């Protein structure tokens, strides 16, 4: 963020810093510990961005009561706030309700506002009456029917006989009070027979048949434990009278639970009172959360399909939240100036807090990466000591970039014991150091200072909401830019699509014009004329910009115009004749302008237009022969004018060719005079110049012959044009179709011949200019070589001037010796031009060593030193250094003892070693063809074997 966008904050910070500096400047000890190292506080200084972000409020660590979590929150307050309140500011939940499972557990209030149309709320459960308690229903049901009465039965003899069979027991009167409740299940067998005659449809009789089992168990217990009872101690009637009122209710709670679990639909429900049965309404509601958020009934409730889908969506959201990077709120570093100026002061403050929070999160993530890397080293060393594999647990956090770290990565890192231990130790150390530092600070600073402000949960949620809003705005703007760029790219990459679009637009315009013509013909004629004039101007501009594209478009437009003309001829023939005459006049003017601008393109276009005109003429002859005769006469008049213009152009070209011939003849004369002057200056180089002129003369003869042949062809064509034009007039008078077709074919042939002649003339002109430039370059090169002669040639020239008679005697001998070698060299040069492997002339390797660098010369042209094997099998090309040799002593003829024919080991041309040359016998100075020829004139040992290429 740029500095000028925080001007209000900067002003406040400067005033605050100035106020603090006035207070603390008296004490040197306190000034030493300040962050700013300024010694003079007379002039206020604008703080840097780092200082501004450093003065942002800190974050309160979260207190949970768990020592390990408290240590983590103390070490990483920003990360802890992100992990704790992460459900508040990701993109999908910041505008909706907060799920209960992601909310903080210590809620301030149990009252929750729920919107009825909110589909993301987990607390949205259909409100209904509590299910009835089956145990209460069972207790409300009577155990026996209301009309049921026990029959009068004397059970005394039966019980007495049963007890009489037991062994005799001593009478224990003290146990009567305690023993009376114990045999309470005993009267159950007496109650078993009466329900048998009752109807089977009576529901209260269902649980009664389960009672005999506890009764039998009770009899066995009585037989073993209470054998001391006898019939004398008990009376059956009194026993029944005491036990029936004190009948304990059976514990049927487990039965009700099983029934609710396995048969939820069979639970009998009491009808609720009127007005109490209410499902979730369509309006907002206020509900009170229950004490136990996970009640037993809510867990056992069978969920509907809608709730299952909602849970599935919430699980997907939680999974996405695990994969969202923690730094999703990262602000872009570059912003437009207009965007920053439009922000309000509150937005600027929130953005400053957001940037400070972002920097703190990045610093904490880097610290956590270091801790995880240290834990990895500790685990690997411990595993190496124990012989275990150190790669059993992966540590991906240290390898992940900071802007890609997610919540799942941090949770996986915190599962490791070593990471948790290191975090706890670091938190303890920081707690000790922070306590000492706060004590020192409180002891040193005696000024009144307010408590440091901290970022609360509301502040963090606010800055996250701002980041989410900014990210949405940036995403929309970037999407708009990308759409524009992509649209432009598609139009550039697909010209066919653009052509189709233009064609469709033109078709729509044509249809619209036809409709308007039918409605108002007079107005449409004027409008069409103005549109055609505008199109003609637009076409001329586009032809200058892009000729190739305009040709295709013009062809399509002409096809559309031809169809439109045919339709209009059928509708109104008289009006179309006048309009066609005006169009043809405009086309003739347009063709003349295009011929002046671009003749080659216009020729191709004329051929296509003539083909279209021929077809159109045939159609019109069939429709209206009288009108076509008049039109043909006007076309012939236009063609006659066109032919006259072409004849004038050909005459001008003939004049230009004659001027060019005269100019070339004068240039040749200048060359001959210059060659004669050079021959007079350097008599030693005369044979070479004569031979070169001898090779150039056939070329000049051929060029002159070609020019004369081209001129003869043009004259023949001009002579043939006049009788052809007369024949065309005679054939135009005859309205037969065959004569017109032949006449058009002959016109096309004549135009093709003219085009070929013009192309040949242009090619000849280019060849002549190229040859003239090459001759000029060769003459300049010879002049340079003449100026750069060796001191030896200067001495020879002086000697020749002093002794002209001896020079005249040696001249014919030198010519006779040199002519065979020069002829052989020229023939070989002409034969081997295609096989020339000379890459280029060597440039100066070092400027301070220019003129002394030497290259080993390949004398026989076989390519390189064969004693050294290179990586590539092909021989390197020959490189010749043409630099002027350094001044040295004259050549001394020393034949020595070697007669090897001038190879690398030969001493046939033993030259004393120059001062700055390489210290090797195989290097010789090859400074150009002239110096080598001079050596060959004096020593003819290698005259026929050496082949230097130019």
UniProtKB/Swiss-Prot annotation:
One of the Pfam families matching this protein, by short name: DEC-1_C
Stretches with biased composition (Low complexity): 268-280
Biased composition (Polar residues): 32-41
Start-end of each Sequence repeat: 493-518, 519-544, 545-570, 571-596, 597-622, 623-652, 653-680, 681-696, 697-720, 721-733, 734-758, 759-788
Keywords from the UniProt entry: Repeat, Secreted, Signal
Domain of life assignment: Eukaryota
One BP annotation, GO: chorion-containing eggshell formation
UniProt-annotated stretches for the region Disordered: 23-60, 184-212, 268-294, 843-875
InterPro entries linked: DEC-1_C, DEC-1_N, DEC-1_REPEAT
Annotated compartments: Secreted
Maturation and modification: Proteolytic cleavage of isoform FC106 generates 2 further products, S80 and S60.
GO cellular component: a single term: nucleus
Statement: the UniProt record of this protein carries the keyword Nucleotide-binding: no
Keyword presence, Cell inner membrane: no
Chain segments carrying region 12 X 26 AA approximate tandem repeats, Glu, Met-rich: 493-788
GO molecular function, one term: cis-regulatory region sequence-specific DNA binding
Leader sequence segment: 1-19
Disulfide bonds: none
Additional information: Allele FC1 is found only in strain Samarkand, allele FC3 only in strain Shahrinau and FC4 only in strain Dilizhan. Allele FC2 Is found in both strains Israel and Ghanghry.
Protein function: Required for proper assembly of the eggshell.
Record protein name field: Defective chorion protein, FC106 isoform
Gene: dec
